């Protein structure tokens, strides 16, 4: 949050949820869209048969080729160019089998150094291509198998091959580096340290001028360069932003998906990172992609927009000014639970803004859908909807709070007081207390806090009293303050709620697994 929001919240007489929690960044154990199958499975990719080639019977090929390994090794180590190409191609075909390719068996033959050597043979591009293809598939294996490729010096020569005059060799080098970078953050940073990014970006400067397959593979590799925790050095990967700003307009779904994922990784972090993403002029198109018919595109687009609105109010307003709210309203009704959850999280960071931004959420007719999810959705979504409503009560005007109450937010907030997650109990208490604060101001004019009766009708008073003995210190303090400040008349009616001699021990427990 920026300074003005902190000052506003500090000026309130009560102790509220810590001010820097109102707007919530994504953390390792945080709320996130579960990686979709494509993202998970394609951190590494194996090149398989050439399109149009005859399908190979897996079992017969493996058995045949494994029997021939000694002779193939002899041929690949010969000085005969024809035999070298023939045996390298045979190894490539063996490694291109779709299911359970014998990567380990090939590594054990000791041919990897020889394959790397072939990459340097500029006057033999067909051999370069076959060797690069074989090494790409070895690098698609386990971390140990990828390490064999790295330890034999392949990264350096693959980076050189990004500038090869031969299209197929360049594309295979792109693919290989994507597989190596996709192995781990260590491998990713190793590839980046070999200065692989500039020639890759050079390939993508004019996407319309190169083959679609190259654009797809290069964008996928670029996405792998940007992904992972710990994050890659931003001073290196920030150079990707102008290229990604072009790629999100490319008319190919695979390219869109990977370009959006790359932007989601780059926008995840400090306000300074967020500003650089905004300055790349991607917000309007990313908001437009929230309405893409394919969920695989919506997902990273929403992740990116969600990251941007974790920034300050001005950064959030950039997103609102390009009509994000109408798309977010639609996403609250997505058939995908993960999308609904992330949309709620995104809205919660918007309602952590100023009163004008809260009004924009109200005007977009989002509150009824939020309240519905708060009352009826799965608990993971309810938590995010609770943050969205609670943040709106913290930063909203009395009129805005009145509107929230009129939409039925009180009962589902009260119902959350019975859950086991202390963090969400405190979020719900925060919302309830903010509503009572607004009601107390109204009572100064009318003599009656209108919201106390609504909370009572929602069985909120009993739930609040039940929390007096909660072991979480923050919960106890909030409940004690609510009772003493707003519910004293009920306390007198019911007698001593805290008998003399009672003692409480508090644990400063927080739910480390809570999705922030």
Swiss-Prot record:
- Compositional bias of kind Low complexity: 502-516
One example of a Gene Ontology biological process annotation: NLS-bearing protein import into nucleus
Feature: compositional bias, Basic and acidic residues: 1-29
Query: Which Pfam families does the entry link to?
Result: Arm (PF00514), Arm_3 (PF16186), IBB (PF01749)
Q: Which SMART domains match?
A: ARM (SM00185)
Q: Where is this protein primarily located?
A: cytoplasm
GO MF term (any one): nuclear localization sequence binding
- IBB domain residues are 1-55
Q: Where in the cell is it found?
A: Cytoplasm; Nucleus envelope
Q: Where is region (Disordered) located?
A: 1-54, 490-516
GO cellular component terms? cytoplasm; nuclear envelope; nucleus
Q: Which UniProt keywords apply?
A: Cytoplasm, Nucleus, Protein transport, Repeat, Transport
Under the heading PROSITE patterns, the entry gives:
ARM_REPEAT, IBB
Q: Which InterPro entries match?
A: ARM-like (IPR011989), ARM-type_fold (IPR016024), Arm_3 (IPR032413), Armadillo (IPR000225), Importin-a_IBB (IPR002652), Importin-a_IBB_sf (IPR036975), Importin_alpha (IPR024931)
Q: Gene3D superfamilies this protein is in?
A: Importin-alpha, importin-beta-binding domain, Leucine-rich Repeat Variant
- Looking at the record's lineage, which domain of life comes first? Eukaryota
Q: Report whether Nucleus shows up as a keyword of the record.
A: yes
**According to the record, where are the ARM repeats?**
55-96, 100-140, 143-182, 185-227, 229-268, 271-310, 313-352, 355-394, 398-437
Query: Is Transit peptide there in the keyword field?
Result: no
Q: What is known of its domains?
A: The N-terminal hydrophilic region contains the importin beta binding domain (IBB domain), which is sufficient for binding importin beta and essential for nuclear protein import.
PANTHER family given in the database record? IMPORTIN ALPHA
What family does the entry list?
A: Belongs to the importin alpha family.
According to its UniProt entry, the function of this protein is described as: Functions in nuclear protein import via a substrate-importin alpha-beta transport complex that passes though the nuclear pore complexes (NPC). Binds specifically and directly to substrates containing either a simple or bipartite NLS motif.
Under the subunit heading, UniProt states:
Forms a complex with tnpo/importin subunit beta.
Write the protein's name: Importin subunit alpha-B
């Amino acid at each position: 949050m920026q300074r003005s929001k902190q000052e506003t919240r500090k000026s309130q007489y009560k102790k509220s949820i810590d001010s820097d929690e109102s707007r919530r960044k994504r953390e390792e154990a945080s709320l996130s869209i579960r990686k979709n199958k494509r993202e998970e499975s394609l951190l590494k990719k194996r090149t398989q048969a050439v399109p149009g080639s005859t399908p190979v019977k897996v079992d017969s090929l493996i058995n045949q080729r494994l029997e021939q390994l000694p002779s193939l090794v002899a041929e690949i180590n010969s000085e005969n160019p024809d035999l070298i190409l023939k045996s390298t191609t045979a190894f490539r075909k063996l490694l291109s089998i779709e299911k359970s390719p014998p990567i380990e068996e090939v590594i054990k033959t000791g041919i990897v150094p020889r394959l790397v050597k072939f990459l340097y043979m500029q006057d033999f591009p067909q051999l370069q291509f076959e060797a690069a293809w074989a090494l790409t598939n070895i690098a698609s294996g386990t971390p140990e198998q990828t390490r064999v490729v790295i330890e034999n010096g392949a990264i350096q020569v693959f980076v050189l091959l990004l500038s090869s005059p031969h299209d197929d060799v360049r594309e295979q080098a792109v693919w290989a580096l994507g597989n190596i970078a996709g192995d781990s953050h260590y491998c990713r940073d190793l590839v980046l340290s070999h200065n692989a990014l500039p020639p890759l970006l050079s390939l993508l400067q004019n996407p319309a001028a190169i083959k679609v397959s190259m654009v797809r593979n290069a964008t996928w590799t670029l996405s792998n360069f940007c992904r992972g925790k710990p994050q890659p050095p931003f001073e290196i990967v920030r150079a990707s932003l102008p290229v990604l700003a072009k790629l999100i307009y490319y008319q190919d779904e695979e390219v869109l998906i990977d370009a959006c994922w790359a932007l989601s990784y780059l926008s995840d972090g400090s306000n300074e990172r967020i500003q650089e993403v905004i300055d790349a002029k991607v917000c309007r198109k990313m908001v437009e992609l929230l309405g893409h018919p394919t969920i695989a595109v919506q997902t990273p687009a929403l992740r990116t927009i969600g990251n941007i609105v974790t920034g300050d109010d001005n950064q959030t307003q950039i997103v609102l000014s390009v009509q994000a709210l109408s798309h977010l309203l639609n996403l609250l009704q997505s058939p995908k639970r993960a999308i609904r959850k992330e949309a709620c999280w995104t809205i919660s960071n918007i309602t952590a803004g100023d009163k004008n931004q809260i009004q924009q959420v109200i005007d977009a007719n989002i509150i009824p859908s939020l309240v519905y999810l708060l009352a009826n959705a799965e608990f993971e979504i309810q938590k995010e909807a609770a943050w969205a409503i609670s943040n709106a009560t913290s930063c909203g005007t009395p009129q805005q709070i009145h509107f929230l109450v009129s939409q039925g937010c009180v009962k589902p907030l009260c119902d959350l007081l019975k859950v086991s997650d202390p963090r969400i109990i405190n979020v719900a208490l925060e919302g309830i207390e903010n509503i009572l604060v607004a009601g107390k101001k109204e009572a100064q004019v009318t003599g009656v806090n209108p919201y106390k009766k609504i909370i009572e009708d929602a069985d909120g008073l009993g739930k609040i009293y039940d929390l007096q003995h909660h072991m979480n210190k923050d919960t106890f303090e909030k409940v004690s303050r609510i009772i003493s400040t707003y519910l004293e008349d009920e306390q007198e009616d019911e007698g001593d709620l805290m008998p003399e001699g009672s003692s409480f021990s508090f644990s400063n427990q927080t739910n480390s697994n809570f999705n922030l």
